[in-house]
């Protein structure tokens, strides 16, 4: 969420960014999507942990509603950097990641959205164990090479 919020801040400051590289970002102010309900318990990122993170990151309801915390609620995302978004299919955050990708696309922002099937939040750290993590590493690296005109 911080990286996505900073992309809007960079746009406002006139600082061109090459890419938003977002790996299972939290983009919403509330845990009210179907994926939050479906994956609230039993996997890596559970609802109590998300509530704990929210409670330790934002001090007030106003801060929680602020689009810089929850970029899905930004008034506009026109002109922000293109985005590569990697999501885990079995993650409470998957729906808000898809929603953020849709918001960017509706604003004309180029988006490459990858949903890695059958994996959970934190899968990107498991490159030695699961092929989806290795694929995500390769996909993210390729997105960076393209953004920096190295390919």
Give the predicted meaning of each segment.
Residues 1-151:
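Alpha/beta-hydrolase superfamily serine-hydrolase fold, recognizing
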């Amino acid at each position: 969420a911080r990286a996505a919020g900073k992309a809007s801040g960079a746009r406002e400051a006139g600082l061109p960014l090459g890419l938003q590289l977002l790996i299972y970002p939290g983009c919403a102010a509330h845990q009210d999507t179907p994926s939050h309900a479906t994956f609230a318990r039993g996997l890596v990122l559970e609802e109590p942990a998300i509530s704990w993170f929210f409670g330790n990151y934002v001090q007030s309801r106003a801060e929680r509603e602020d689009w810089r915390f929850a970029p899905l609620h930004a008034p506009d995302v026109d002109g922000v950097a293109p985005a590569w978004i990697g999501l885990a299919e079995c993650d409470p955050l998957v729906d808000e990641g898809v929603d953020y990708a849709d918001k960017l696309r509706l604003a004309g922002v180029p988006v490459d959205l990858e949903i890695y099937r059958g994996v959970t939040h934190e899968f990107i750290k498991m490159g030695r164990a699961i092929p989806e993590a290795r694929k995500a590493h390769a996909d993210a690296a390729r997105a960076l090479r393209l953004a920096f005109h190295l390919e």
